[in-house]
From Swiss-Prot:
Motif May be involved in DLG4-binding boundaries: 520-523
Example GO biological process: exploration behavior
UniProt source species: Rattus norvegicus
Protein name stated in the entry: Leucine-rich repeat transmembrane neuronal protein 1
Residue spans, topological domain Extracellular: 35-428
Bilayer-crossing regions: 429-449
Topology class, membrane: Single-pass type I membrane protein
Amino acid sequence: MDFLLLGLCLHWLLRRPSGVVLCLLGACFQMLPAAPSGCPGQCRCEGRLLYCEALNLTEAPHNLSGLLGLSLRYNSLSELRAGQFTGLMQLTWLYLDHNHICSVQGDAFQKLRRVKELTLSSNQITELANTTFRPMPNLRSVDLSYNKLQALAPDLFHGLRKLTTLHMRANAIQFVPVRIFQDCRSLKFLDIGYNQLKSLARNSFAGLFKLTELHLEHNDLIKVNFAHFPRLISLNSLCLRRNKVAIVVSSLDWVWNLEKMDLSGNEIEYMEPHVFETVPYLQSLQLDSNRLTYIEPRILNSWKSLTSITLAGNLWDCGRNVCALASWLSNFQGRYDANLQCASPEYAQGEDVLDAVYAFHLCEDGAEPTSGHLLSAAVTNRSDLAPPESSATTLVDGGEGLHDSTLEPITVAIPGGEHAENAVQIHKVVTGTMALIFSFLIVVLVLYVSWKCFPASLRQLRQCFVTQRRKQKQKQTMHQMAAMSAQEYYVDYKPNHIEGALVIINEYGSCTCHQQPARECEV
């Protein structure tokens, strides 16, 4: 069939005048893409791709046509003038990153209709006109990161219906205009991290029905309202790390398919009880390094699909309010950080939350403590072991049919609580005994080493001990003899009135004295 059509065309052309044939051939040649001009000096050409990188160029090369790709990165371009790339109508990608560009005129990209990828990152651009990207309706990827943009023109991205990736990281953007992305219906990735955003308008992200990943980390946001992300039905990941967020609220009751949320490194003190009910498919949540003191039971009940959570670095108050969190963690089968420490009260500061619940009997109600089960469940979770068949029944378990009124006070019924306490007591006794034996063995070892290494010193020390003991015995003997002599003076002495010899007895012997009869003097 193709050969038949070709033959008919040739037959028709041969029957026409030669002038008509020449005109038709000229028109065909004009429709063919032009071949690229000669490769500029010091540049690298690969077919219809031109790489003029790190050549300290201050202007783009001239007389270029027929190129499909042009890279001018790592040069010294300072300005993009109007019509600078008009001869590159076949161009599909243009790299201008890592230059010194500070000015981009509104019609600098005229006649670049086929460009799909544009990179302007790592320059010094402070503003872009509304018409900057109008000549390039087929753009798929735009990179404006690491510039000095302070504001975005309201219609900067107007008409970019095929745009899928937009990078604006590390600028100085302070505000996102309302409906600025209204025409970006195909956008899937948006990065506005590391800017100076202080607030978000409710319709700033309107129209992004296909957006799957949104980065807003390292800004100055002080409040997060899920109503600022309306109808982002395809959003899968939301990063709000390292802002100044103090509260998290949701003023719209609607459900979205978010699976990953990062709120770490903020200043969160309060979260509305129903805030996570709008994200029932959430699997990964980062809440570490905030100022949370406790978590509402209603929030815990809404974390049914979580498989990973980080809660460390908060100001946990290990009072009665921590019981709901402790019970939820004891039943949680996913991954969570093990270093949850109490910040208050003083007697529990620095203690692990679950250990404090057990040690200080924080969640006891009547005679049945909750601590034994919480500790055993925590150990089970941390060692990735399967939970026991007869697990405890708690009021905060993420199950069905629970209301807020049933969560105060929180109690835990534990059939084997006494066995757990007995096991802990036995463990303490065994630990103490082993410590005592270990101490005794250390003392014996020290004596043995001393005896082997310093025998003369030990012999002298033993002789000193023996000499001192002998002296002590002699002193005791002298004291005993003195005591016996004193008893003889007071017990055996019998005075008599017989005139004659007096016998004096002391410890050195006896002495006899003769007493002369007294004579009375006459007066």
